[in-house]
């Protein structure tokens, strides 16, 4: 089945929602009806899709009557309230928030890694955290060939991961500082938290709120989601997540330990050359390596700077970059929808 699909996009006016619409159009995703939904505040907004002007409607339980696939990206509270209502009315929900990711009955899917988990869905499929998606997509081919027992990651994440308001704050702060004007941070690192810091010309080692164990919620998302997606509950994972003053594109320095001592850098490169959804950019002699500015607007995960650890024969270092609004959100969601069609699950 594929014809006659009715697709709804919830959060259609947000950064990720806009990218979802662009991705659906770019992929020529086959459907008969597209419904755009948002909060009451954004209802009435006009959006163009494939040359046709559509009006965004206020999301309600009744909005999902007749919907086959609902792509959610309007915040966790909206997903918690409306995703079950969509499922009750027969829709399959692909949710881009953290609301259901660690629910044991909800598959958490990166199609290049665990597409088969889609068979186990009960109406809701969770899209992982942006920084998790790009990392596991890069690590899965290595894990399949050589095993994996440890992952240590430091992330360098773009401001767009915190939403449109954060991007506007980056722009306004940058302009103010260049003009030697005073700034009053209001959003970063966490809107509504006790303190706010300058993001322009700065690096903030906090993404989301701190937990009792000293890790941030973002770091714990990476740790727990990686184990779930890879079906490796005993995998050792540690993460440090940092916000940088760039608009789009997350970068990650990843250290891994595999189960064998005999793998070479060339072995790892050859695996990644053939990996779906991965582009290898790694030639130190030509200063070729991934950078976020080059990844913007592209669906792939880019990997480079692959080195064998100098002390541990089973250790490797990688640099992983991706567009956080595409593979980290919109493209992975649409990929899941495409997989549902391919597997005849919708």
Swiss-Prot record:
NADP(+) binds at residues 13-16, 41-42, 160-161, 324. It catalyses: L-aspartate 4-semialdehyde + phosphate + NADP(+) = 4-phospho-L-aspartate + NADPH + H(+). One of its GO terms (molecular function) is NADP binding. The keyword Nucleotide-binding does not apply. The keyword Cytoplasm does not apply. Transmembrane segments: none annotated. Pfam families: Semialdhyde_dh, Semialdhyde_dhC. Keywords: Amino-acid biosynthesis, Diaminopimelate biosynthesis, Lysine biosynthesis, Methionine biosynthesis, NADP, Oxidoreductase, Phosphoprotein, Threonine biosynthesis. Catalyzes the NADPH-dependent formation of L-aspartate-semialdehyde (L-ASA) by the reductive dephosphorylation of L-aspartyl-4-phosphate. Homodimer. This is Aspartate-semialdehyde dehydrogenase. It comes from Bacillus subtilis (strain 168).
């Amino acid at each position: 089945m594929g014809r006659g699909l009715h697709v709804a996009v919830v959060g259609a006016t947000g950064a990720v929602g806009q990218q979802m619409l662009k991705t659906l159009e770019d992929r020529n995703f086959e459907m008969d009806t597209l419904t755009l939904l948002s909060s009451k505040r954004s209802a009435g907004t006009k959006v163009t899709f494939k040359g046709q002007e559509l009006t965004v409607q206020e999301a309600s339980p009744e909005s999902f009557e007749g919907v086959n696939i609902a792509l959610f990206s309007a915040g966790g509270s909206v997903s918690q309230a409306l995703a079950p209502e969509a499922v009750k009315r027969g829709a399959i929900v692909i949710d881009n928030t953290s609301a259901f990711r660690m629910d044991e009955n909800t598959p958490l899917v990166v199609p290049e890694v665990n597409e088969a988990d889609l068979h186990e869905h009960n109406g809701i499929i969770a899209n992982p955290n942006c920084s998790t998606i790009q990392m596991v997509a890069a690590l899965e081919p290595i894990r399949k060939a050589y095993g994996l027992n440890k992952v240590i990651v430091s992330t360098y994440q773009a401001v767009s991961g915190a939403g449109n308001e954060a991007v506007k704050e980056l722009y306004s702060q940058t302009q103010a500082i260049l003009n030697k004007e005073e700034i009053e941070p209001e959003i970063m690192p966490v809107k509504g938290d006790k303190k706010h810091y300058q993001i322009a010309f700065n690096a903030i080692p906090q993404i989301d709120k701190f937990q009792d164990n000293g890790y941030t919620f973002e770091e714990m998302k990476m740790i727990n989601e990686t184990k779930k997606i890879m079906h490796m509950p005993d995998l050792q994972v540690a993460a440090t997540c940092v916000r940088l003053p760039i608009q789009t594109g997350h970068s990650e320095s990843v250290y891994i330990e595999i189960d064998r001592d005999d793998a070479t850098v060339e072995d790892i490169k050859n695996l990644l050359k053939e990996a779906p959804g991965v582009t290898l950019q790694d030639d130190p002699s030509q200063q070729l390596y991934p950078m976020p500015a080059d990844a913007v607007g592209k669906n792939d995960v880019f990997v480079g700077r692959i080195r064998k650890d100098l002390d541990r024969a089973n250790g490797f270092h990688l640099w992983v970059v991706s567009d956080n609004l595409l593979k980290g959100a919109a493209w992975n969601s649409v990929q899941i929808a495409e997989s549902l069609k391919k597997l005849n699950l919708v």
